[in-house]
């Protein structure tokens, strides 16, 4: 464990599903493994040996974090999946990363999932370097990929290397800083060292042109360097590296490297770039949180062992021997096995059993967890993803993570009584691991309904129930997570809750107004909801202040069950305008019931409508099927928003209701003889057309 945080990097490797992220990660673990076993000669262990070893110790590659070492530096790699249904995994990794490597397919350039992951990284302000992978692939084009980084991501790439050759003739890269060629010629064994050569004559002019751009970008970012550069002096390699590092850490530029991880070309320079340009925990600096019980009091923790202990749990994983592993990023302070800490999010104390760092092929017990690093804790009982762990005597709640609500649900029915019990265990374990996996009981049918981010997400969860927990169950058809909202304001609605029959009565009178509510995300304070707002406009104590939260709670209760078909209500602002109370008969419960009923009656008058999830769909198809594909999208109530060319194929972008996309994968295959593919990402909620809404409401209310 390195104590010097200047030598620590917490990074993630992020990519579209087939860009080669796993191979890149494996090669990084391989090369850093060699680096760790100093003194052992490398005996040409082939990729397959490594892969078998990977399979045997499957826990680490699938684990949330692996620690490895490179040239005296420690690199903690946090794994992120590439499939859109698992965006929550990406979201939670990015929350605890300091930097990331974005891997792009050298033929496809920036793909839809790359765009989404890039946007998520921008949300958490994570500095990135880019690796254009698969340069050996037929049709690979480095310059096209760099252009897509500009066009599709709106980012400023800083080209650090140029490829030497392409496809089968890809032999290495030109290093634009050192102005040397780094080559791996012919078939390269895993672990082979590159050869440093002169730049090939046919690339000399291009290399000079790109180096000039690079030097100019760095010089323009610093006055002293600018004077030196425009005064005709050369900038030193050290000055250039320091300038690039500063620009990268500030997310002003994104260094671009290239290679082919599968063919073992370009990985070592990528690791060098991770160390040279991505930030340390010290570069990231202090983290912000708030006081327990008062979100308005801002607290900070510096990345130092001298500060009080604070950490964020970012993933829970099951382990065959240790039960539950809780992966945490320690932001400040130091903690030892056996210590009692506070879970300030839950208001409970936890005792830490063992502490591990996950190394490339084993769990490594450590005797302390220090600021700036990533660990697995064992023995925590109540901690879930997004919880803060901290010093019991100096508590803080760190900013948590936002998890999207599920967009798709299925009912699941165990086949036997023993399956029923196993299902309970499976659901508990899986929902601990995955915050976007939800479970509810359908009161009408008595069925268990599970929710997730897409068909694949639920397939994987159901499959895990069968494999890991031996649950045999029947799975129903997918259901869409509809919502309800209102289209017009209701200025005043009066409701009196009255029950005065013997003994203590109940009395509460409220006058509320409601209106549609759709704030801009940027205007929201931390912790504020984007779908509901409550305002108290009562004056003169006509409703005592201790009853105001009860009215709010009653309104929120009523929003769980909408007017049209019982779907949750969203995007409503409710204002408590006036009311009345009784000295003896008023209570919190009376005002809660009054708030609840008032909302129900107000919604009925506010032109309620049904909302459905819209998906952003991108179909890549050969040109001859394009008409068919577009016609099919239109028949699914989709709206085509753009058409592009990409790598010899056509790209159709559209917004389509999720309810119309079930089974699309099979339809698309048969329509295009298996030659088209698509990606689908949740986009937004939109109003359901009246005729379709009428059918959904009738079916839901049993009047169809």
UniProtKB/Swiss-Prot annotation:
Location relative to the cell: Cytoplasm
Domain of life: Bacteria
GO MF term (any one): GTP binding
List of residues binding GTP: 15-22, 79-83, 133-136
Keywords (A to Z) from UniProt: Cytoplasm, Elongation factor, GTP-binding, Nucleotide-binding, Protein biosynthesis
tr-type G domain residues: 6-282
SUPFAM superfamilies: EF-G C-terminal domain-like, P-loop containing nucleoside triphosphate hydrolases, Ribosomal protein S5 domain 2-like, Translation proteins
GO cellular component: a single term: cytoplasm
General function of this protein: Catalyzes the GTP-dependent ribosomal translocation step during translation elongation. During this step, the ribosome changes from the pre-translocational (PRE) to the post-translocational (POST) state as the newly formed A-site-bound peptidyl-tRNA and P-site-bound deacylated tRNA move to the P and E sites, respectively. Catalyzes the coordinated movement of the two tRNA molecules, the mRNA and conformational changes in the ribosome.
Name assigned to this protein: Elongation factor G
Organism: Corynebacterium diphtheriae (strain ATCC 700971 / NCTC 13129 / Biotype gravis)
């Amino acid at each position: 464990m390195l104590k010097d945080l200047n030598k620590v990097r917490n990074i993630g490797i992020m990519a579209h599903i087939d860009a080669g992220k796993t191979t890149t990660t494996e090669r990084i673990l391989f090369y850093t493994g060699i680096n760790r076993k100093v003194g052992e000669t490398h005996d040409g262990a082939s990729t397959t040996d490594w892969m078998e070893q990977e399979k045997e110790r499957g826990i680490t590659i699938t684990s949330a974090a692996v620690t490895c070492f490179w040239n005296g530096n420690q690199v903690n790699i946090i794994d992120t999946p590439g499939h859109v249904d698992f965006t929550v995994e990406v979201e939670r990794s990015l929350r605890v990363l300091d930097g990331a490597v974005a891997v792009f397919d050298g033929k496809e350039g920036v793909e839809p999932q790359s765009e989404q992951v890039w946007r998520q990284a921008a949300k958490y302000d994570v500095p990135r370097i880019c690796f254009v992978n698969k340069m050996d692939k037929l049709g690979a084009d480095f310059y096209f990929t760099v252009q897509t980084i500009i066009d599709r991501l709106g980012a400023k790439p800083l080209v650090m290397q140029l490829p030497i050759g392409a496809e089968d003739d890809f032999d290495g890269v030109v290093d634009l800083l050192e102005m040397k060629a780094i080559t791996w010629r012919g078939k390269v064994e895993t672990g082979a060292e590159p050869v440093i050569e002169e730049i090939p004559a046919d690339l000399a002019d291009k290399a000079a042109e790109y180096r000039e751009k690079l030097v100019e970008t760095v010089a323009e970012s610093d006055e002293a360097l600018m004077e030196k550069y425009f005064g005709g002096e050369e900038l030193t390699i050290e000055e250039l590296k320091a300038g690039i590092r500063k620009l990268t850490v500030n997310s002003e530029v994104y260094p671009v490297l290239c290679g082919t991880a599968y063919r073992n070309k370009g990985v070592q320079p990528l690791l060098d770039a991770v160390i040279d340009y991505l930030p340390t925990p010290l570069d990231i600096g202090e983290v912000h949180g708030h006081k327990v019980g008062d979100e308005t009091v801002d607290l900070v923790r510096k990345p130092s062992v001298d500060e009080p202990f604070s950490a964020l749990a970012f993933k829970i994983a099951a382990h065959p021997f240790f039960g539950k592993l809780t992966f945490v990023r320690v932001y400040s302070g130091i903690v030892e096995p056996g210590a009692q800490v506070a879970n300030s999010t839950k208001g409970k104390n936890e005792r830490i059993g063992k502490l591990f760092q996950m190394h490339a092929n084993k769990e490594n017990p450590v005797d302390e967890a220090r600021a700036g690093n990533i660990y697995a804790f064992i023995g925590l009982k109540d901690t879930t993803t997004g919880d803060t762990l901290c010093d019991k005597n100096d508590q803080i709640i760190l900013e948590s993570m936002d998890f999207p609500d599920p967009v798709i649900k299925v009912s699941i029915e165990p086949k036997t009584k023993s399956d029923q019990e196993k299902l309970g265990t499976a659901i508990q374990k899986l929902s601990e691991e995955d915050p976007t996996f939800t479970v509810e009981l359908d009161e009408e049918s008595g069925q268990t309904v599970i929710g997730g981010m897409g068909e694949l997400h639920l397939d994987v969860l159901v499959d895990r129930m069968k494999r890991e927990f031996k649950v045999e169950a029947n799975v129903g058809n997918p259901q869409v997570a509809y919502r309800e909202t209102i289209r017009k304001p209701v200025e005043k609605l009066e409701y009196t809750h009255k029950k005065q029959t013997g003994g203590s009565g109940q009395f509460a009178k409220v006058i509320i107004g409601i209106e549609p509510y759709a704030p801009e995300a940027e205007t929201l304070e931390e912790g504020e909801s984007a779908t509901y707002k409550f305002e108290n406009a009562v004056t003169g104590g006509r409703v005592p202040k201790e009853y105001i939260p009860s009215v709010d709670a009653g309104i929120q209760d009523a929003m769980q069950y909408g007017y049209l078909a019982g779907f949750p209500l969203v995007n409503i602002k409710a204002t408590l305008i006036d009311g009345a109370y009784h000295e003896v008969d008023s209570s919190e419960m009376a005002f809660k019931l009054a708030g609840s009923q008032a909302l129900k009656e107000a919604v009925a008058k506010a032109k309620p409508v049904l909302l459905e999830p819209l998906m952003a769909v991108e179909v890549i198809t050969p040109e001859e099927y394009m008409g068919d594909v577009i016609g099919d999208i239109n028949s699914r109530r989709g709206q085509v928003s753009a058409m592009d060319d990409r790598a010899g194929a056509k790209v159709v972008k559209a917004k389509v209701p999720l309810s119309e996309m079930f089974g699309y994968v099979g339809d698309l295959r048969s329509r295009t003889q298996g030659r088209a593919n698509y990606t689908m990402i949740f986009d937004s909620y939109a109003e359901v057309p009246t005729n379709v809404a009428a059918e959904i409401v009738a079916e839901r209310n049993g009047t169809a």
